UniProtKB/Swiss-Prot annotation:
Entry binding sites for GTP: 17-24, 77-81, 132-135
Reactions catalysed: GTP + H2O = GDP + phosphate + H(+)
Binding site for Mg(2+): T24
Cited Gene3D superfamilies: P-loop containing nucleotide triphosphate hydrolases, Translation factors
Span of domain tr-type G: 8-210
Disulfide bonds: none
Tagged with keyword Protein biosynthesis: yes
Family statement: Belongs to the TRAFAC class translation factor GTPase superfamily. Classic translation factor GTPase family. EF-Tu/EF-1A subfamily.
Name this polypeptide is given: Elongation factor Tu, chloroplastic
Protein species of origin: Chaetosphaeridium globosum (Charophycean green alga)
InterPro entries for the chain: EF-Tu_GTP-bd, EF-Tu_GTPase, EFTu-like_2, EFTU_2, P-loop_NTPase, T_Tr_GTP-bd_dom, Transl_B-barrel_sf, Transl_elong_EF1A/Init_IF2_C
Broadest EC class assigned to this enzyme: hydrolase
Chain's role: GTP hydrolase that promotes the GTP-dependent binding of aminoacyl-tRNA to the A-site of ribosomes during protein biosynthesis.
Any one biological process term the GO annotation gives: mitochondrial translational elongation
Amino acid sequence: MNIFRDKKTHINIATIGHFNHGKTTLSAAIAMTLANKKYRLDKKSIKVTLEEKNQGIGIYTHHFQYETTLRHYSHTDCPGHTDYINNMIAGISQVDSTILVVSAVDGSMSQTKEHLLIAKLLGISSFIVFINKEDQLDDDKFVYLVQKEISQFLMSHGFQTNKIPIVSGSALLALETLIQQPNVLRGENYWVDKIYTLIELLDSYIPKPKRKKDKHFLMWIDSVKFLPNIGPIAMGRIEQGTIKVGEFIDIVGFRETRTAKIISLEFFNQSCMQVLAGDDIGVSIEGTKNHNDIKKGMIISTPGTIKSWLEFEAQVYILKREEGGRTSPFFKGYCPQFFFKTTCVTGRIEAIEYTTGSKTWMIMPGDKLKIQVNLVYPIGIKKRMRFLIREGGVLVGVGIISNLIK
């Protein structure tokens, strides 16, 4: 395995934005541009991503890697369709920064706003905007108008627009050029040069993340793949700590916690003996044979460091209508979906209390309250953990766990 981490900063990044605005095409164009410069490319992942693009809809999050002269990137291509928002939330919950893709023809759409809001609520503060499909504009002057519209949109969501880079281009024309002319150089094609500009911004604009390498090992499982004669491989990004082959971990969530041994580790299909915080990895665990043993949303962690919980208290903020939230109140007994990292679980709101301490039975959009939640099954969570609340296709609110009950 090429150990990049001794020489290059590792960054987890995602493409987000509205359905059919070109996220997958841009992801492929970035990777193929860097492959042309002889940097590493996970060609199998790009092939799968492009096949899904040809089917006309992105359903799953796809992961692949690439390198620049300065950094190594793990790239998550998030689905934009509203029916698969659960996969998008799971994917974006584990990244350091994002590329917001907006069509120059359509401008900001419903999923543009929701994806941006989700990223903001999950604590992602740095991102780059790529205005795609520039080639479809009749006049170059329209590019400026689209940039202005995007800036106003970002400003309305509380972002400092002077600190957010905006690049325009055509991911499709760049990708077609790279496929037809694999050896095209910078300066030889206008659209490929736009991708180079974006790549330079990835290196210069996105801050170096602070990794928690000295804490106990913790990873939320994002997906599970099955390999013949091996069994399930748990995939995910390491939240904190390090782990080695042969060490023991707890499998937490959905059922009784089990302790098992790490059989093997992989980093983008390459075997390795040790992995660190921030790495996107695959883990083979002793004793896991099927979907009941290991599944998306479970946690693997250093034994005894995290538990499963059914009930918790949290401080929450309920989004207003103009923020993309509900238009009407809800009441005690309300059962939305709660999103914790890669886990989505239904919960019942059992108690509601204002910040002043007085109890209430009704929650209005814009309220800040303390709630008590009873989940339908136990999951691995911890104090001060951030989560999203969603129901009926609407982002209801955001919260932070203040107390774990049982």
